[in-house]
């Protein structure tokens, strides 16, 4: 069983009180020193000034030091030291989530940003045992890339699943791409069906809901871009290959390896997987991704995924 870390933070009420009172206290002390100078002479006043400096230094250092931070903040910092002290490949599921949370909070200043970036660049993978007995591997493809669905900021890390075998699923049942990703069969599987249910409960709880954009139809002049809140999602053509960012910008990992519409993902992988992008100016086609040929390939939306095909989906922590 993995160790559950609890994180929190914030400036302690005690420190806030000291800061709030400090201006008034400074004024009163300065007034006292002024009176002492008049009635007792500069020698005594100098001694008082020294004591005053010590007090102000103590008050001013409260937020940056450890004297006035909360127990929760201390625990958070210690926990992040542990995560930062490990190689990213050795991060537990809890530590992956902790790293993502800290990166979302602190950006490039996060103590784990460099290690997460190095792991993304190197293609480092993690794995999780699914409820169906199979193992799923995944890797980082984006850092502070996706917008949280609640509007509170960015998801720290975006991951992409290497493959998830799921035969017998169609993008859409009817012979049209109308409705696009939002109404697709695959999205329902990712929301609450076979795919979602295969993930362990503690894994599900760590996944963040993000906003994804997609066109609702391939029909010329009749399509519009819609936003959907998604925990598991297929990558769009632009997130994979770059270019027009209507459905999102290219993930950093794919840009790093030079993936474009005219490149190959990898000849060793012959599987086919859907993207969430419908093909423009068509009535019934969607873009799919192939490893053994140019990704510029489309399929009829009602085509069924066969046993040699898979779903490659993404998620965020």
Model-inferred region functions:
Residues 1, 24, 46, 173-177, ...:
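Short intrinsically disordered, low-complexity coil segments enriched in acidic
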Residues 20-41:
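N-terminal single-pass transmembrane signal-anchor helix
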Residues 41-69:
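Aliphatic-rich helix starts adjacent to a transmembrane/signal segment
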Residues 72-317:
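Collagenous Gly-X-Y triple-helix signature in extracellular proteins
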């Amino acid at each position: 069983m993995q160790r559950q870390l609890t994180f929190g933070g914030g400036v302690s009420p005690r420190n806030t009180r000291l800061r709030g009172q400090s201006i008034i206290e400074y004024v009163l002390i300065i007034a006292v020193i002024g009176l002492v100078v008049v009635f007792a002479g500069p020698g005594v006043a100098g001694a008082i000034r020294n004591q005053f400096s010590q007090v102000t230094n103590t008050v001013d250092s409260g937020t940056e030091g450890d004297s006035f931070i909360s127990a929760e903040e201390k625990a958070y910092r210690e926990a992040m030291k542990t995560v930062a002290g490990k190689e990213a490949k050795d991060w537990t599921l809890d530590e992956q989530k902790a790293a993502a949370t800290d990166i979302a909070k602190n950006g490039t200043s996060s103590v784990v940003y460099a290690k997460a970036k190095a792991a993304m660049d190197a293609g480092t993978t993690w794995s999780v045992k699914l409820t169906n007995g199979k193992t799923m591997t995944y890797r980082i493809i984006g850092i502070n890339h996706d917008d949280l669905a609640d509007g509170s900021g960015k998801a720290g890390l975006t991951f992409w699943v290497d493959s998830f075998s799921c035969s017998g699923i169609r993008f859409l049942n009817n012979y049209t791409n109308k409705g696009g990703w939002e109404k697709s069969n695959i999205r329902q599987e990712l929301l609450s069906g076979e795919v979602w249910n295969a993930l362990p409960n503690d894994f599900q709880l760590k996944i963040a809901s993000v906003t994804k954009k997609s066109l609702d139809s391939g029909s010329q002049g009749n399509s519009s871009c819609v936003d959907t809140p998604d925990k598991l999602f297929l990558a769009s053509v632009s997130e994979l290959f770059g270019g027009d960012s209507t459905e999102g910008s290219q993930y950093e990992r794919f840009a790093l390896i030079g993936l474009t519409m005219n490149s190959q993902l990898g000849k060793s992988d012959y599987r086919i997987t859907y993207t969430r992008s419908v093909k423009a100016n068509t009535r019934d086609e969607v873009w799919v991704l192939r490893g053994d040929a140019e990704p510029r390939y489309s399929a009829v939306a009602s085509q069924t995924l066969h046993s040699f095909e898979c779903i490659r989906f993404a998620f965020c922590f």
